[in-house]
A protein has these predicted regions:
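Conserved S-adenosyl-L-methionine
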Residues: 179-298, 315, 319-321
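Conserved beta-strand/loop positions that form the S-adenosyl-L-methionine
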Residues: 147, 202, 206, 310
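C-terminal edge-of-domain segments
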Residues: 145-158, 375
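SAM-dependent Rossmann-like transferase core, predominantly class I methyltransferases
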Residues: 156-192
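Non-catalytic nucleic-acid substrate-recognition regions in nucleic-acid-modifying enzymes
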Residues: 2-141
Length: 380
């Protein structure tokens, strides 16, 4: 890929998964990948950018940088947006659009106000050209714009995602405290599970960790079958896009004999939610869900990997109820899982202490705004 053909872009990532996100971007063909806070910047060809939309598991969004300009206030922003692109080509009045803004600049400290200035610049220019303007659509716009303000610089990007990439489409049923799919995929990547040994979730909830693990092992691209905003770009290359779609489809391992993937869930209603999600993902023959407490079941022949996102006790009075769960989990692991690895997402160090085990690794991540640690235990 010649440097002149490279596009500048940013992947928006879950907090704590920046390094894992950079690794994934590089493996899929991105260049000059550099971690940022909750993001990574990179260079890519158009083919690579299409590939990332289809195959990357960790990003929330992928933003293609289109223009940058000095911005020291409202007037600079208004004028800069009007000059940023050939809007006659990119935004016809028949198209809807939305604007998202992050960061701040002099006199532009509120994202809603800054977005309003971008909107005004665009619709004023449309009226000058066509005598009519586009409508705003916050749910399913034809063109999604992203503006980042960094002190005295504005960067305008196109959001090719068409909705957050963490929404895979299989999640028909939500758990009480749902784990986002891209965070789940990142946690599985950090665990090092590669599909060669059993994987068990003793508190599986709606099954997201197991589903994302199975999809990774089968190399099933998360973006296949969904619509993307980039398909409405003025320079969209349909043949190149189809090539990348076919490439993603061909990667899927259809006859792979995976070791056992097992989820255990005490609440029968939640266990049924997991089965619904697994069926929606087409993984009924890959993942087994068992009802009841993990103390009532035996692990498959190992060694293998245990992954777990138990409750954190966020509500008043819950901690006392959960003390027994963590204590029982620690006993279960020590009794049954000799030689296994345990990875547990902890949002409450006090409760995790009830395991009576010492973690060998503590990786900071954020789950739904809760400061968490992805803890690793080597069971002896």
């Amino acid at each position: 890929m010649g440097r002149e053909n490279r596009l500048s872009a940013v992947a928006v990532l879950p907090q704590g998964l920046e390094a894992a996100g950079c690794d994934e971007l590089s493996k899929l063909g991105a260049h000059e990948v550099r971690p940022l806070r909750r993001a990574a910047e990179f260079q890519a060809s158009m083919a690579c950018l299409y590939r990332l939309h289809l195959q990357a598991r960790l990003p929330f969004r992928l933003l293609r940088e289109m223009a940058s300009f000095p911005c020291q206030g409202r007037d600079d922003l208004y004028d800069g947006i009007r000059r940023a692109l050939n809007w006659e080509r990119w935004l016809h009045p028949s198209m809807s659009f939305r604007v998202d803004v992050t960061g701040s600049a002099p006199g532009l400290n509120h994202s809603h106000y800054s977005a309003l200035q971008v909107k005004n610049a665009l619709v004023d220019q449309q009226r000058d050209i066509w005598g009519q303007r586009s409508s705003i659509d916050l749910e399913a716009p034809d063109l999604s714009l992203h503006l980042h303000l960094n002190r005295e610089t504005a960067v305008l990007s196109l959001d090719g995602s068409g909705g957050s990439l963490h929404r895979r489409g299989y999640r028909a049923a939500m758990g009480v405290a749902p784990l986002k799919e891209n965070l789940a995929a990142g946690l599985i990547q950090l665990s090092g599970w590669d599909g060669s040994v059993p994987l068990v979730d003793p508190c599986c909830g709606s099954g997201i960790l197991l589903i994302e693990a199975a999809l990774m092992a089968l190399q099933q691209a998360p973006g296949l079958g969904r619509n993307f905003g980039l398909e409405g770009w003025a320079d969209f290359q349909s043949e190149l896009w189809q090539e990348e779609c076919e490439r993603a489809q061909q990667r899927r391992r259809r006859n792979l004999n995976l070791p056992p993937l097992l989820g255990i869930e005490q609440d029968p209603l939640v266990a049924e939610q997991a089965r619904v999600n697994i069926a929606a993902a087409g993984l009924e023959e890959v993942i087994e869900i068992r009802d009841g407490s993990f103390t009532e079941h035996h692990l498959p022949e190992g060694p293998g990997v245990l992954v777990c996102n138990p409750p954190y006790g966020q509500r008043i009075g819950e901690e006392e109820e959960l003390d027994h769960l963590y204590s029982a989990l620690g006993g279960f692991v020590r009794e049954q899982a000799s030689g296994w690895q345990l990875w547990l997402l902890s949002g409450n160090p006090k409760l995790t202490g009830g395991l009576r085990m010492k973690a060998s690794r503590r990786i900071p991540v954020s789950n739904g705004g809760i400061d968490c640690r992805w803890l690793h235990y080597a069971i002896r």
